[in-house]
Amino acid sequence: MSGKDRLPIFPSRGAQMLMKARLAGAQKGHGLLKKKADALQMRFRLILGKIIETKTLMGDVMKEAAFSLAEAKFTSGDINQVVLQNVTKAQIKIRTKKDNVAGVTLPVFESYQDGSDTYELAGLARGGQQLAKLKKNYQSAVKLLVELASLQTSFVTLDEVIKITNRRVNAIEHVIIPRIDRTLAYIISELDELEREEFYRLKKIQDKKREARIKADAKKAELLQQGIDVRQQANILDEGDDDVLF
């Protein structure tokens, strides 16, 4: 296993616990991001369907509004200059709200009429019915345009957030979690190797002690056979020397 495939960390019990905690955190984060991506995808598809529906309806409404304008011009003449000379302020205005979807803030636009219709009775003498129909149709068109702008803004915002979220999900799933897994496997293998080395070292110490005791006992027996009393002699094996480490 190359160093690039795992995190640079010294193998120890503490490092093993740390990697297990990081793995659990990465898996939990992956699950939460996956749920967020699914929620955003559902809202994205819903908005896409509304955009298609609104655009289809928008074509019909604009056709009706254009036809109403032609009727009003035919019955009342050119009313453009009259409207431009008498207009003071916009009666249809836009207000914004915020919608939250899985932690993502989406702007929502709404149209509303500010005050009463100043020109409600305008044109009654000549084609008043056509003018009223014209205003109604263009109000519907403006309302749909505002709704469409709101939907398309949310669509673009969600599209970008979904791409970022999916990149994060893929990074955690295919890079971070596998790297932590490999690091954890490396730590476990190194700790196992250290345990085997420690066991071998202790076994060698015990073997050397046993060999030394056997030699001492053989020497003692030989001295006893020669009639030498060794009970009062110091035994080097009884001394409290430190164990020899190999």
From Swiss-Prot:
Record gene name: Vha36-1
Subunit-level organization: V-ATPase is a heteromultimeric enzyme made up of two complexes: the ATP-hydrolytic V1 complex and the proton translocation V0 complex. The V1 complex consists of three catalytic AB heterodimers that form a heterohexamer, three peripheral stalks each consisting of EG heterodimers, one central rotor including subunits D and F, and the regulatory subunits C and H. The proton translocation complex V0 consists of the proton transport subunit a, a ring of proteolipid subunits c9c'', rotary subunit d, subunits e and f, and the accessory subunits VhaAC45 and ATP6AP2.
Role played: Subunit of the V1 complex of vacuolar(H+)-ATPase (V-ATPase), a multisubunit enzyme composed of a peripheral complex (V1) that hydrolyzes ATP and a membrane integral complex (V0) that translocates protons. V-ATPase is responsible for acidifying and maintaining the pH of intracellular compartments and in some cell types, is targeted to the plasma membrane, where it is responsible for acidifying the extracellular environment.
Keyword Transport: yes
GO MF annotation list: proton-transporting ATPase activity, rotational mechanism
Keyword Transport (UniProt): yes
Keywords: Hydrogen ion transport, Ion transport, Transport
Protein's UniProt name: V-type proton ATPase subunit D 1
Organism listed in the record: Drosophila melanogaster
Record InterPro entries: V_ATPase_D
Similarity field: Belongs to the V-ATPase D subunit family.
GO CC annotation terms, alphabetical: plasma membrane proton-transporting V-type ATPase complex; proton-transporting V-type ATPase complex; vacuolar proton-transporting V-type ATPase, V1 domain
Biological-process GO terms, alphabetical: proton transmembrane transport
